[in-house]
Amino acid sequence: MGNAAAAKKGSEQESVKEFLAKAKEEFLKKWESPSQNTAQLDHFDRIKTLGTGSFGRVMLVKHKETGNHYAMKILDKQKVVKLKQIEHTLNEKRILQAVNFPFLVKLEFSFKDNSNLYMVMEYVPGGEMFSHLRRIGRFSEPHARFYAAQIVLTFEYLHSLDLIYRDLKPENLLIDQQGYIQVTDFGFAKRVKGRTWTLCGTPEYLAPEIILSKGYNKAVDWWALGVLIYEMAAGYPPFFADQPIQIYEKIVSGKVRFPSHFSSDLKDLLRNLLQVDLTKRFGNLKNGVNDIKNHKWFATTDWIAIYQRKVEAPFIPKFKGPGDTSNFDDYEEEEIRVSINEKCGKEFTEF
């Protein structure tokens, strides 16, 4: 690298530091005094279910007064308690209301009633990366790199706030109207200084240290990035099998096979991300995220332009207007029932 290039890189890294310091101030203000009860259910018309989960659903809604569309996540308090997800749910809302980054879905309102918790988020009509990846088969390396760069920047932001994301997978990445990523579902995100021990995540994406019940840190997100990049470029994840236990055996073995079409730079990056030895895993070394950002596979990536959303996206989802749901699957609709008596009041005081 010439002197001029090195100087440019140095000043870029300095300005990133300043940016992150300011971002942390803004985050901490909201983290310490979270917003509460900023809307209510009858402010919205419910249109259609976009997805379902074990203790709730996500619905497309329309704000009656403004006509804006949102995605409303509805969580049944009793089910959350039964599935021991109180802590995770409180984390999710507290984190979402405090973060602010171009590739994180925005929480617009949150509130609760006798039966449910509600998080109302920006609606991202392009649907999940998962469905586009399955339809196309696999993404070209430039296409995969465009998405990977956004995740790298997002993790750099989150980790600087001591947040671990812990649930990276194509199902949690939505594609917006400009073809950029919106990361959604902060159900497993957690503010951690040092290490944590909870077993959570999706089998194919779990880092070896989580499977081995070791204390783990932010490095699990960099492992998951390796899994995601592999899956985007191959069309299938690096470790898969019929049963989770077989997947876990493959993950901890540290053996990865690459499709013959992977470039040598891609294989090199993935060997450094899918690295069982934490003292060698990229993102976890003394240069932190810069080992990833400066890797040859990302040589053509203009990080600032990606952050500013100035790079032309390789793919724009088809979309017919603000309330279009054609990029989402259909689900059986269910009435939202609200009890006349308060359920689980004290468990969710801080929501």
UniProtKB/Swiss-Prot annotation:
<dbReference type="GO" id="GO:0001707">
    <property type="term" value="P:mesoderm formation"/>
</dbReference>
<dbReference type="GO" id="GO:0016607">
    <property type="term" value="C:nuclear speck"/>
</dbReference>
<keyword id="KW-0723">Serine/threonine-protein kinase</keyword>
<dbReference type="GO" id="GO:0007193">
    <property type="term" value="P:adenylate cyclase-inhibiting G protein-coupled receptor signaling pathway"/>
</dbReference>
<feature type="domain" description="Protein kinase">
    <location>
        <begin position="44"/>
        <end position="298"/>
    </location>
</feature>
<keyword id="KW-0496">Mitochondrion</keyword>
<dbReference type="GO" id="GO:0045722">
    <property type="term" value="P:positive regulation of gluconeogenesis"/>
</dbReference>
<dbReference type="GO" id="GO:1904262">
    <property type="term" value="P:negative regulation of TORC1 signaling"/>
</dbReference>
<keyword id="KW-0472">Membrane</keyword>
<comment type="subunit">
    <text>A number of inactive tetrameric holoenzymes are produced by the combination of homo- or heterodimers of the different regulatory subunits associated with two catalytic subunits. cAMP causes the dissociation of the inactive holoenzyme into a dimer of regulatory subunits bound to four cAMP and two free monomeric catalytic subunits. Activates cAMP-sensitive PKAI and PKAII holoenzymes by interacting with regulatory subunit (R) of PKA, PRKAR1A/PKR1 and PRKAR2A/PKR2, respectively. Interacts with NFKB1, NFKB2 and NFKBIA in platelets; these interactions are disrupted by thrombin and collagen.</text>
</comment>
<dbReference type="GO" id="GO:0005737">
    <property type="term" value="C:cytoplasm"/>
</dbReference>
<dbReference type="GO" id="GO:0030007">
    <property type="term" value="P:intracellular potassium ion homeostasis"/>
</dbReference>
<feature type="binding site">
    <location>
        <begin position="169"/>
        <end position="172"/>
    </location>
    <ligand>
        <name>ATP</name>
    </ligand>
</feature>
<dbReference type="GO" id="GO:0048240">
    <property type="term" value="P:sperm capacitation"/>
</dbReference>
<feature type="active site" description="Proton acceptor">
    <location>
        <position position="167"/>
    </location>
</feature>
<feature type="modified residue" description="Phosphothreonine; by PDPK1">
    <location>
        <position position="198"/>
    </location>
</feature>
<dbReference type="InterPro" id="IPR000961">
    <property type="entry name" value="AGC-kinase_C"/>
</dbReference>
<dbReference type="GO" id="GO:0071377">
    <property type="term" value="P:cellular response to glucagon stimulus"/>
</dbReference>
<keyword id="KW-0597">Phosphoprotein</keyword>
<feature type="binding site">
    <location>
        <position position="73"/>
    </location>
    <ligand>
        <name>ATP</name>
    </ligand>
</feature>
<dbReference type="GO" id="GO:0006611">
    <property type="term" value="P:protein export from nucleus"/>
</dbReference>
<dbReference type="GO" id="GO:0070417">
    <property type="term" value="P:cellular response to cold"/>
</dbReference>
<dbReference type="GO" id="GO:0045667">
    <property type="term" value="P:regulation of osteoblast differentiation"/>
</dbReference>
<dbReference type="GO" id="GO:0045879">
    <property type="term" value="P:negative regulation of smoothened signaling pathway"/>
</dbReference>
<feature type="lipid moiety-binding region" description="N-myristoyl glycine">
    <location>
        <position position="2"/>
    </location>
</feature>
<feature type="domain" description="AGC-kinase C-terminal">
    <location>
        <begin position="299"/>
        <end position="351"/>
    </location>
</feature>
<dbReference type="InterPro" id="IPR044109">
    <property type="entry name" value="STKc_PKA"/>
</dbReference>
<dbReference type="InterPro" id="IPR000719">
    <property type="entry name" value="Prot_kinase_dom"/>
</dbReference>
<dbReference type="GO" id="GO:0045542">
    <property type="term" value="P:positive regulation of cholesterol biosynthetic process"/>
</dbReference>
<dbReference type="GO" id="GO:0048471">
    <property type="term" value="C:perinuclear region of cytoplasm"/>
</dbReference>
<dbReference type="GO" id="GO:0000287">
    <property type="term" value="F:magnesium ion binding"/>
</dbReference>
<feature type="modified residue" description="Phosphoserine; by autocatalysis">
    <location>
        <position position="11"/>
    </location>
</feature>
<dbReference type="GO" id="GO:0019901">
    <property type="term" value="F:protein kinase binding"/>
</dbReference>
<dbReference type="GO" id="GO:0071374">
    <property type="term" value="P:cellular response to parathyroid hormone stimulus"/>
</dbReference>
<feature type="modified residue" description="Deamidated asparagine">
    <location>
        <position position="3"/>
    </location>
</feature>
<comment type="function">
    <text>Phosphorylates a large number of substrates in the cytoplasm and the nucleus. Phosphorylates CDC25B, ABL1, NFKB1, CLDN3, PSMC5/RPT6, PJA2, RYR2, RORA, SOX9 and VASP. Regulates the abundance of compartmentalized pools of its regulatory subunits through phosphorylation of PJA2 which binds and ubiquitinates these subunits, leading to their subsequent proteolysis. RORA is activated by phosphorylation. Required for glucose-mediated adipogenic differentiation increase and osteogenic differentiation inhibition from osteoblasts. Involved in chondrogenesis by mediating phosphorylation of SOX9.</text>
</comment>
<dbReference type="GO" id="GO:0071333">
    <property type="term" value="P:cellular response to glucose stimulus"/>
</dbReference>
<dbReference type="GO" id="GO:0098978">
    <property type="term" value="C:glutamatergic synapse"/>
</dbReference>
<dbReference type="GO" id="GO:0051726">
    <property type="term" value="P:regulation of cell cycle"/>
</dbReference>
<dbReference type="GO" id="GO:0005739">
    <property type="term" value="C:mitochondrion"/>
</dbReference>
<dbReference type="GO" id="GO:0106310">
    <property type="term" value="F:protein serine kinase activity"/>
</dbReference>
<dbReference type="GO" id="GO:0005930">
    <property type="term" value="C:axoneme"/>
</dbReference>
